Regions:
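Hydrophobic "anchor" residues on beta-strands that sit immediately upstream
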Residues: 25, 48, 93
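Domain-level recognition of nuclease-like catalytic cores that cleave nucleotide substrates
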Residues: 86-118
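Mid-chain, well-packed structural core segment of small domains
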Residues: 60-92
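Conserved catalytic cores of phosphodiester-cleaving nucleases, focusing on short active-site segments
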Residues: 19, 38-64, 68, 76
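Anionic group-transfer/hydrolysis microenvironments
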Residues: 30, 39-41, 54-56, 99-102, ...
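Acidic-basic catalytic patches of nuclease active cores, encompassing PD-(D/E)XK
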Residues: 1-29
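Short acidic/glycine-enriched loop/turn segments that link adjacent beta-strands
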Residues: 34-36
Length: 118
């Protein structure tokens, strides 16, 4: 596994633990279809939440959240609709969150959870 892939995978593990610690139920991780991939899908109460996870080793080139563009968010919304057509899940609404993770050389991961970004 490439170092970049390992960092991303670790970040997704941190994000899943983060939302589970807040009482979410994780429904899917790394769900793929021909249109793209969703990093994390979960239920926050009765709200279906689709999460884009961005992980970086530093903020030298900007924060991880800054890497999530409006174009990417539009794609995530389309993928969320596709996910819902393929899964029998009832939700009062759908929300898109971004979890931005910085992995410093020493110490714990820094997690920023941005809720309802679109």
């Amino acid at each position: 596994m490439r170092a970049k892939d390992a960092v991303g995978r670790y970040g997704e593990d941190v994000a899943a633990a983060h939302v589970e610690a807040r009482g979410w139920r994780v429904l899917d991780r790394n769900w793929r279809c021909r249109y793209g991939e969703l990093d994390l899908v979960g239920m926050d109460g009765d709200v279906l939440v689709v999460v884009e996870v961005k992980t970086r080793r530093s903020t030298a080139y900007g924060t991880p959240a800054e890497a999530v563009t409006w174009r990417k968010l539009a794609r995530i919304r389309r993928l969320a609709a596709q996910w819902l057509t393929e899964h029998d899940v009832r939700a009062s609404s759908v929300r898109v969150d971004v979890i931005a993770i910085v992995l410093p050389h020493a110490g714990a991961a820094q997690v920023e959870h941005l809720q309802g970004v679109c």
